[in-house]
């Protein structure tokens, strides 16, 4: 019985992962021009809530919510949901400079527009670092100039590559661009800043993080004064009595 329950949970997890991957691929194509940055699925017994994260939420919603209703209808038909069992919401990305997906899409549109690779990458690098990131790494690979494919890496700031903090501090995204000379691959990695509030970065500090506490200002006395301390009284210890020898 327990084995059947485990298999059922495993199948349910696989189905949920496939649904999220297909939904992400669908929304990536539909909302590419609207700053699509990711999707979050919250499933309840009654219905499923799909939260679309984008930089331009007004374009996602459309005039009087028309576009979000059309997307809801398409998702219901494409993924076999019953009518009224799925709801789509749009959430604005608070700081798009720290969103790897948004910056990857921004770099993709710059390359499609004909901007030079080096200039486009340095522009994205500068914008991410000005947004408060600890570090950034941009890799562009493919036929960039000649017929031979190569990769160009642009790095700035601090970047960690191993350990458990990678799961909390590193955001990465991969996109592909179809240009005239061939397909160009783009990879953007951003190291988020430490934020105790949890808004722009993780709340957990790095293991090697050292916080220096500012010393308190010493309050100087305005007038001369003296302190009288009570003197400790000497406690007299009774002298040891001689012990009579044992005969």
Swiss-Prot record:
Residues in KH type-2 domain copies: 23-94
GO terms classed as biological process: positive regulation of apoptotic signaling pathway; translation
Superkingdom assignment: Eukaryota
Amino acid composition bias (Basic and acidic residues), ranges on this chain: 219-235
GO molecular function: RNA binding; structural constituent of ribosome
PANTHER family: 30S/40S RIBOSOMAL PROTEIN S3 (PTHR11760), SMALL RIBOSOMAL SUBUNIT PROTEIN US3 (PTHR11760:SF32)
Protein name, as recorded: Small ribosomal subunit protein uS3
Organism: Caenorhabditis elegans
């Amino acid at each position: 019985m327990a084995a059947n329950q485990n298999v059922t949970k495993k199948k349910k997890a696989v189905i949920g992962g496939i649904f999220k991957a297909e939904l992400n691929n669908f929304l990536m194509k539909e909302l590419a021009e609207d700053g699509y940055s990711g999707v979050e699925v919250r499933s309840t017994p009654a219905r499923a809530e799909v939260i679309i994260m984008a930089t331009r939420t007004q374009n996602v919603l459309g005039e009087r919510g028309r576009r979000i209703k059309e997307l809801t209808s398409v998702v219901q038909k494409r993924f076999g949901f019953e009518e009224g069992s799925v709801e789509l919401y749009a959430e604005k990305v608070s700081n798009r400079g720290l969103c790897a997906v948004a910056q990857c899409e921004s770099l993709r549109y710059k390359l499609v527009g004909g901007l030079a690779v080096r200039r486009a990458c340095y522009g994205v690098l500068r914008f991410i670092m000005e947004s408060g990131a600890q570090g950034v790494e941009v890799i562009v690979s493919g036929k960039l100039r000649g017929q031979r494919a190569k990769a160009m890496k642009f790095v700035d700031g601090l970047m960690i590559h191993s350990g458990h903090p990678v799961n909390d501090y590193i955001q990465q995204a991969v996109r592909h661009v179809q240009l005239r000379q061939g397909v160009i691959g783009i990879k953007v990695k951003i190291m988020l800043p430490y934020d105790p509030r949890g808004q722009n970065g993780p709340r957990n500090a790095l293991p090697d993080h050292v916080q220096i506490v500012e010393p308190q200002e010493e309050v100087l006395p305005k007038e001369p004064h003296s302190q009288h301390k009570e003197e400790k009284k000497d406690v007299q210890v009774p002298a040891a009595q001689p012990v009579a020898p044992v005969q």
